[in-house]
A protein has these predicted regions:
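Residues that define the transmembrane beta-barrel architecture of outer-membrane proteins
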Residues: 47-53, 104-110, 144-152, 224-230, ...
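Short, flexible helix-coil linker/hinge segments at the edges of structured domains or between repeats
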Residues: 81-94, 138, 171-224, 249-259, ...
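Residues on the lipid-exposed face of transmembrane beta-strands in outer-membrane beta-barrel proteins
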Residues: 55-59, 110-116, 152-158, 230-236, ...
């Protein structure tokens, strides 16, 4: 970890920067954990365990550098209900169910990257990060989830002396599908809640059309998000900076059944300064982020003629608007034996939800944490 953190380019989207360092390292780890307690979120397990393995490597050759890692994790949680998503809060919509049960989550991830010197002053490279996860709940209301998170980022760098300039393109796709089912023979159906923002939405029988968990033509709840953007990097001696912009376009539904659309914009900036002393190396880092996201609900009409059902889209209503700003300063001092790190994360978020005109609900949050 110290080798990775020593090179500021490793935290950027431009893989060509790994050649700004010449240290080759490999790493492997196996881990396990057990958790139990009542101080937890609504969707977290009453008790649970996880185990997994991680391996990573960076290799530098004469004109080429390679970077890669692989990880696997399995988590078992007991007494779980609430959000049906693998990563609650990642998307602006959520679905909640209320019967505690056991959940199993398996996560596979790998990343790879290559950087190549095409001339004395120019480098090119590309990287890919891939993560796949599946989760299942074994008690009604049962559900199975499949999640994908993939990022591809080609980059280029010009470097001469103490100066290095870089640029990279970023493409990211995330997707998750939820398939719900009721196997048991309960006297009544189970209920679920579709959260459309700030805990306003639809509460009904899980198979009702308002929840979209079980609809004619679509038997899953699919969410997709595509992001395209670019980043610029600069390094001069111990100073490093990067600015990144992403334009996102997300949908809930598939084919003609697009129930929600959530476009957004994201800007992130990071800066770092390194001073290498005789016995210690000092690092100062600063991250700043801004994100804006809107969500529109489609107005769909189903018309059946002669046994054929057609779906007509009559436009959409804006039902949610989110905007957030985050700041994260950090200081680190690393020596041969001792390492000290301290920092803070501050985040401001404003949300406006309006399910039905002219009624609206506004929320303003400020979160912070400090660590050492």
């Amino acid at each position: 970890e110290r080798v990775v953190r020593d090179n500021f380019w490793n935290s950027s989207s431009n893989i060509t920067g790994i050649r700004q360092d010449s240290i080759s390292r490999s790493y492997a780890e196996a881990y396990g954990s057990y958790e139990k307690g009542g101080f937890r979120d609504t969707w977290q397990a009453v008790k649970g365990w996880s185990a997994g393995a991680v391996t990573a490597s960076i290799r530098h050759l004469e004109k080429i550098s390679l970077k890669g890692s692989f990880a696997f994790d399995q988590t078992e949680g007991y007494g779980m209900c609430g959000s049906m998503f693998i990563d609650p809060g990642f998307y602006p919509v959520d679905i909640l169910e209320f019967t505690p049960g056991r959940k199993t989550l398996q996560t596979y991830s790998f990343d790879g990257g290559i950087s190549y010197d095409i001339s004395e002053d120019w480098r090119i490279g590309a990287s890919m990060d891939f993560e796949s996860a599946n989760m299942s709940k074994r008690k009604d209301l049962r559900h199975s989830n499949w999640k994908l998170d993939m990022t591809i980022a080609p980059g280029v760098m010009y470097h001469r002396g103490d100066l290095a300039l870089g640029a990279s393109y970023i493409f990211r796709k995330t997707a998750e599908s939820i398939k719900a089912e009721q196997v048991g023979t309960a006297e009544s159906s189970y209920y679920a809640f579709l959260d459309k923002g700030l805990m306003y939405g639809v509460y009904s029988v899980w198979s009702g059309s308002g929840l979209h968990l079980s609809e004619a033509g679509v038997n899953i709840f699919p969410v997709k998000d595509f992001s395209n953007g670019a980043a610029l990097q600069m390094q001069y001696k111990g100073l490093f900076a990067e600015v990144e912009y992403l334009r996102t376009q997300g949908t809930v539904g598939e084919k003609e059944y697009i129930w929600f659309l959530f476009p957004g914009n994201e800007v992130n900036a990071i800066a770092g300064y390194k001073i290498r002393g005789k016995h210690h190396t000092h690092y100062a880092r600063l991250g700043i982020g801004w994100e804006s996201l809107m969500m529109d609900e489609s107005i769909l009409e189903k018309v059946t003629e002669n046994g054929v059902t057609n779906v007509f889209n009559h436009g959409s209503n804006r039902i949610l608007a989110n905007e957030s700003i985050s700041v994260s300063p950090e200081y680190e001092a690393a020596g041969r034996i001792l390492e000290i790190r301290a920092g803070a994360v501050l985040k401001w978020k404003e949300s406006l939800s309006s399910q039905m005109y002219p009624y609206a609900d506004y929320q303003s949050l400020m979160n912070w944490k400090a660590y050492a």
